[in-house]
Amino acid sequence: MLTYALVALGSAIGGTLRYWLSMVIAEASAGTFPWATLVINVAGSAAIGLFATLTSVDGRVFVPSEWRTFFMVGICGGFTTFSSFSLQTLALAQDGDWLAAGLNVVGSVALCLLAVWLGHVAATIINR
């Protein structure tokens, strides 16, 4: 039960950080390129990579498993799910499974873009 509470708290923190940072970046940048999303996804990926490695079995920092979950699933997940995707893809590549890593990248991007488009089409039909 504690782990669920930690994930919920971490998600709230991560989501709040994402919203705040996206507002800061949006004010600082101009144009239509999604700078805030890019920066947040890259920052979240860097954070989960750093934390996962530092707190792994071979890492220099001991963190109980529920606190790893709090940060990696809760905060990073609330901040961006792209961080989990990046960590999982890195794990595939490090295991030498380059085909699976590549398919994960291409498949995720293609399927997510398709899903966004299908959702848009469905909403457009509903809105008529």
Curated annotation (Swiss-Prot):
Topological category with respect to the lipid bilayer: Multi-pass membrane protein
GO biological process: cellular detoxification of fluoride
Binding site for Na(+): G77, T80
GO molecular function (one): fluoride channel activity
Catalytic activity: fluoride(in) = fluoride(out)
Localization annotation: Cell inner membrane
Keyword Flavoprotein among record annotations: no
GO cellular component, one term: plasma membrane
Stored InterPro entries: FluC
UniProt keyword annotations, A-Z: Cell inner membrane, Cell membrane, Ion channel, Ion transport, Membrane, Metal-binding, Sodium, Transmembrane, Transmembrane helix, Transport
Residue ranges crossing the lipid bilayer per the database entry: 5-25, 32-52, 70-90, 106-126
Activity regulation description: Na(+) is not transported, but it plays an essential structural role and its presence is essential for fluoride channel function.
Family, similarity comment: Belongs to the fluoride channel Fluc/FEX (TC 1.A.43) family.
Role: Fluoride-specific ion channel. Important for reducing fluoride concentration in the cell, thus reducing its toxicity.
PANTHER family from the UniProt entry: FLUORIDE EXPORT PROTEIN 1-RELATED
Name listed for the protein in its UniProt record: Fluoride-specific ion channel FluC
The species this protein was found in: Paramagnetospirillum magneticum (strain ATCC 700264 / AMB-1)
Source taxonomy: Bacteria, Pseudomonadati, Pseudomonadota, Alphaproteobacteria, Rhodospirillales
Gene giving rise to this polypeptide: fluC
